[in-house]
């Protein structure tokens, strides 16, 4: 009877290398997807922070021009049934030359620059004050580009 003595295997086979490479590539793809999702979430968070800063921007302008704010010259619309204030979405629609009109125009222009872009019709600002100086400011934008839930609203309440 013939006896076959196998030599012990040395090194790794090509299949083992390919399997290891496949597992590593899936891991790297998963890490890349996780990084992309984190970047989208970071962008969404940055927009929310910018919206808050921009609401303080118009509130500070109204504090400087308190008399006009109490005369309701900064109001952009009235409150509807869903709690939204009539917004301004286009700075060019504000044609007045008073300090209040200039402040609103500058505010909407800055909103578009920091959150959306000048052609964006979904980035809007809204202000509603009463004669006692109690004000609500809403900033709206579309967050779907950043993987968000669509229209976002940041609302700030303040007394002048």
Q: Where are the language model's segments positioned?
A:
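N-terminal leader/signal peptides at the extreme start of proteins
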Residues: 1-12
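N-terminal signal-anchor/signal peptide hydrophobic helix marking the start
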Residues: 10-22
